[in-house]
Amino acid sequence: MLDLKRIRTDFETVAQKLATRGVSEDSLNHLKELDEKRRQLLVSSEELKAERNLSSAAIAQAKRNKEDASQQIAEMQKMSADIKAIDAELAEIDEKVTEIITVLPNTPHDSVPVGADEDDNVEIRRWGTPREFDFEIKAHWDLGEDLDILDWERGAKVTGARFLFYKNLGARLERALYNFMLDEHAKEGYQEIITPYMVNHDSMFGTGQYPKFKEDTFELKDSNFVLIPTAEVPLTNYYRGEILDGKDLPINFTAMSPSFRSEAGSAGRDTRGLIRLHQFHKVEMVKFAKPEESYEELEKMTANAENILQKLNLPYRVLALCTGDMGFSAAKTYDLEVWIPAQNTYREISSCSNTEDFQARRAQIRYRDEADGKVKLLHTLNGSGLAVGRTVAAILENYQNEDGSVTIPEVLRPYMGGAEMISPK
């Protein structure tokens, strides 16, 4: 959530930055008008309360002197009624302010490229060279079925579209991947966490999913629970409402969890395969950092995600997302896209973001600065390290062989009992 004081004191800058994210100045002007009205009413309310206190003292004195205080009592009753009316108007304005400010996205960092959509993202670097095949390659969904390791037909029967069963060495490959990812992040100083897979509405608000993106989630009916769309939500909210010791920062968390997404608005996109599912595993990284260190931590987090792809020897590229393509809470985001041979393109496999104090303000996560003793909002960061199903897709396609088999990447073999190949039965 943006700082209302910042909007008030630096309106033009905030308006200019949000315009690059598609926010009209009209909504900001309305917010500014409401804020000004609110401040005027607060002044009026305080003045009336001060007058009422004086009147109350005068009435008490008149009664002690056995003087008639009926006029003063009537005036005080009118003041009380006026205060009540102002308080009611303030509550109404506060509600309107909340409605606007809670759906405004974060302001982009100065280094973020300005653009409308994914076409305006800027490629930063590439790693690895896409393999040249001398045979007709298969898509990962065909490989999965031919190798008897992925079953979409029964997934659709048991649940519905965009669900599947992993089986045999497919299940083991998935498990090997997330164990490998967690182990790699642990080496980099991340604390491993097993989170709840349901959170309450306050947690969804804290990380910015609620109220704006409610339609993208799976809520449990007649409850305060939501299935997590990412482990970012429980990990970030771990410290919601707390004050941390500055000397303990940065704090790094990692967790593997299922992620549940309704994929509202994705009809017709990636209807086959592992790219877009309602339920998938993802290894998440979350950091809590001091403001002056958060962009250095973003580079480290991105490197941690890249490390996984490099050790798996999967070609990828890194993009700096433009203002029009960034997520709601992000101030800056790097996307990692892995090479998918059957689609002859790179597809997103990780997104690493610095939200600055946007989530911390919503979730009230603060730290005590050891330098001056003051309590301040910290910065939160989050990143995929990696989306496991998409990594399975990338391995199946990049490591496929002419005979229909798939070679298991060397770093995963210790996690798969030494198996080197997934072969057709």
From Swiss-Prot:
One of its GO terms (cellular component) is cytoplasm. Pfam families: Seryl_tRNA_N, tRNA-synt_2b. Pathway: Aminoacyl-tRNA biosynthesis; selenocysteinyl-tRNA(Sec) biosynthesis; L-seryl-tRNA(Sec) from L-serine and tRNA(Sec): step 1/1. HAMAP family: Ser_tRNA_synth_type1. Homodimer. The tRNA molecule binds across the dimer. PANTHER family: SERINE--TRNA LIGASE (PTHR43697:SF1), SERYL-TRNA SYNTHETASE (PTHR43697). This is Serine--tRNA ligase. It comes from Streptococcus uberis (strain ATCC BAA-854 / 0140J). The gene is serS.
